[in-house]
Amino acid sequence: MKKSTHLLIASILAGCITSCSSGKRIAQHRIVTNPMNLNYRFQPKDESRREAADPVLEYFKGYYYLFASKSGGYWRSEDLAGWEYIPCTTIPTLEDYAPTILPIGDTLYFTTSSGKTQIFKNAHPEKDTWEAVDTKLTYRLHDPAFYSDEDGKVYMYWGCSDKDPIMGVEVDPKDGFRALGEAKALI
């Protein structure tokens, strides 16, 4: 009985060893997890919390551009794995919350939540050479977002309240993002 048990165990082990050492290799895929080592800032007041909230990402001229609140700059990447940080001093509202960006043609546009709506543009965002747009949009935007429809129309929507609705209006980017009509409650 002992011999048959030993023989059975030896056979199982031999089978396992043979199958494990077969010439077949399992393809290994690189797994990327959180490849960005963002230079998050910390809020200096009250409890210490990390910043860089409200991320927004757009593909523009072969690169992904990422903006986040209170980050002192923005990032770009060709492959979403390797990121280059671009410090920014030419957008005075960069340190405000809730950025939004919009590529139109060869230009990238930027705005944030601020007391006065200011929009900036840059045809070469790999460089910190942003210029102010003569902004004609007069609504005070809280958590704004650009939206470009398939028909070429551009909209701005905004809102962050437990009482007020999310608002939206069609805008004309060729005329300082002037509102085309009245803002409407969307939600």
Region roles according to the model:
Residues C20-I187:
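Carbohydrate-active catalytic/glycan-binding domains of CAZyme proteins
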